[in-house]
């Protein structure tokens, strides 16, 4: 029985070919990982546990270093056998030490803030050189265009304050003022007091 011929791999395309779309890679068998998935998971778990223990140990060392430093700076006072005057002197000394520590803390915080501001300024300078800033032009916008840009095209806001006012002509205004000014005459005419008022206003009209 004749042996079957193995299939030949596809020919590699040249870069000068019109249908070339990428670098040609020779076909090869898929590599199998030497470590199984369960073994990988076990190794990751061990690494995470080791990192957790290291972090806990570093935190304990940092806390111990802090306590040691505080013990050197502020040793526990010895109060046995001290009188009132000695206790007062000790209190004044502690208050002075607290003031000095507070001043040092403020100075240190100021230096840290200044350094952070300088670092931020340098970062902005470095980032500013990477981009080309476009030239800004001054554009004059009307009040309606500005409100439309802020509120959107759906909201139409008019800035004409006289739009909602009532328009009154000059002759109508004079008529209304004349009617308002003659309200006493209208009241007298309606009440029948107009003739009597003239009678009393005439000279000697009220004498019989």
Swiss-Prot record:
Coiled coil: none annotated. Keywords: Acetylation, Actin-binding, Muscle protein. GO terms for cellular component: troponin complex. Residues 28-73 are annotated as: Involved in binding TNC. GO terms for molecular function: actin binding. Gene3D superfamilies: 1.20.5.350, 6.10.250.180. Transmembrane segments: none annotated. GO terms for biological process: cardiac muscle contraction; skeletal muscle contraction. Residues 1-37, 54-74, 168-208 are annotated as: Disordered. Residues 54-71, 168-187 have a biased composition (Basic and acidic residues). The modification N-acetylalanine is found at residue 2. Binds to actin and tropomyosin. Belongs to the troponin I family. PANTHER family: TROPONIN I (PTHR13738), TROPONIN I, CARDIAC MUSCLE (PTHR13738:SF2). Troponin I is the inhibitory subunit of troponin, the thin filament regulatory complex which confers calcium-sensitivity to striated muscle actomyosin ATPase activity. This is Troponin I, cardiac muscle. It comes from Coturnix japonica (Japanese quail).
């Amino acid at each position: 029985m004749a042996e079957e011929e193995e299939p030949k791999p596809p020919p590699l395309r040249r870069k000068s070919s019109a249908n070339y779309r990428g670098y040609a890679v020779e076909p090869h068998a898929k590599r199998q990982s030497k470590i199984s998935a369960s073994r990988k998971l076990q190794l990751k778990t061990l690494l995470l546990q080791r990192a957790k223990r290291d972090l806990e140990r570093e935190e304990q060392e940092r806390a111990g270093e802090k306590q040691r430093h505080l013990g050197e700076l502020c040793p526990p006072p010895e109060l046995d056998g001290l009188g009132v005057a000695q206790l007062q002197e000790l209190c004044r000394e502690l208050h002075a030490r607290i003031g000095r520590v507070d001043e040092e803390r403020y100075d240190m915080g100021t230096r840290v803030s200044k350094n952070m501001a300088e670092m931020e300024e340098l970062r902005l300078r470095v980032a500013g050189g990477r981009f080309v800033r476009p030239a800004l032009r001054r554009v004059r916008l009307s009040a309606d265009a500005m409100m439309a840009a802020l509120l959107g095209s759906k909201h139409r806001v008019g800035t004409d304050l006289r739009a909602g006012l009532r328009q009154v002509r000059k002759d109508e205004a004079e008529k209304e003022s004349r009617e308002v000014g003659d309200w006493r005459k209208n009241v007298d005419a309606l009440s029948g007091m107009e003739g009597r008022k003239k009678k009393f206003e005439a000279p000697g009209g009220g004498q019989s």
